[in-house]
Structures are given as C-alpha cells and as structure tokens.
C-alpha cells in the first residue's frame, strides 16, 4: 500500500476508534470514519499478539494489504478505516480472507465492492 493510503500514528487510530462506526464479522472488525476533505481512503491494520507469533501476524497483515491493493478501485475515497483481525484469520487461506474482508466492507455500507474473488 502506498503511503497516502496508510494510517500510522496512534492519535489517528484513536480518532477512528472514538468517532468512527464499527462493523464486524467473525474474522474482522472494521472501524470507519468519514473524512470528506481527504482525496484518498486510508487504512490502518491491527493484529493482536493473541492471534499468533510474529510470523502468523505478519502473514495476516500481508494478505490483508494484498486484498486492499486489489480492491483499491472499489473502496470509497474520503474515509479512514481501521481493520482489526480476529483469531480465525490465522487459519484462513488468502481467498477466504479476501472474501471475509469484502463481506465486512459490504456490511459497513460500501456499495461498489463486488463479491467476486479473483484468483
């Protein structure tokens, strides 16, 4: 993901947590905050130590980033997202993870996201 699409600072994460809306499924919690003045969407990732060791956590983050890269044209601009991975992500394949991410994005009200998973 490019720098313009990332949330890195703790205070930016906290703003999304406190002022944003959340949606969840079994694998992810997604917090969403509208920022009309911003030309791009931004995404922050959080994968807890409860999920597994560093290898597992980094694998999950890589798969989420790749999914976001493939979906970037369909994600609404002018929004900040924080994606929190839950324990079931550790055993998921890339296709399952992407499908679950699309599901939770649709629950959050994004209409442009398509259900098809490209292999």
Curated annotation (Swiss-Prot):
Record key words, sorted: Endonuclease, Hydrolase, Nuclease, RNA-binding, tRNA processing
GO cellular component, one term: ribonuclease P complex
Taxonomic superkingdom: Bacteria
Enzyme class: hydrolase
UniProt KW NADP keyword: no
Catalysed transformations (reactions): Endonucleolytic cleavage of RNA, removing 5'-extranucleotides from tRNA precursor
A Pfam family per the record: Ribonuclease_P
Molecular function GO terms recorded: 3'-tRNA processing endoribonuclease activity; ribonuclease P activity; tRNA binding
Biological processes annotated in GO: tRNA 5'-leader removal
E.C. number(s) listed in UniProt: 3.1.26.5
Family: Belongs to the RnpA family.
Function: RNaseP catalyzes the removal of the 5'-leader sequence from pre-tRNA to produce the mature 5'-terminus. It can also cleave other RNA substrates such as 4.5S RNA. The protein component plays an auxiliary but essential role in vivo by binding to the 5'-leader sequence and broadening the substrate specificity of the ribozyme.
Subunit structure: Consists of a catalytic RNA component (M1 or rnpB) and a protein subunit.
HAMAP family the record matches: RNase_P
Record-given protein name: Ribonuclease P protein component
